[in-house]
């Protein structure tokens, strides 16, 4: 899977042996399928949230209007963000498209630091950056 995940698991084992609470949250570990287009996700799926009885809202957007994706000739793809309906906290990020193996890090950061969709929407990045900004605006 991921070398970084294996490293974190090793640290978690050492923490547990030392009587500490392991720091790793497996919900925040990204999954990536290196195909063309790439597929990546982190956090909960809609099915998991429904099974847990969590009320959520969903935002989706595509790469069709993204200048960088258009310049790359890879404007096909979509991003879906799931957020708690009451708190707006991001619960899951799912995507397919160009370089989403890198873009998923934005979702990992949001989950790790309990960000809301509004928190992510307020971040300003360079214009031609592939990101989930438009998706959280849809929430």
What are these regions, as identified by a protein language model?
Residues 132-139:
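Single conserved hydrophobic/aromatic residue that forms the stacking wall/gate
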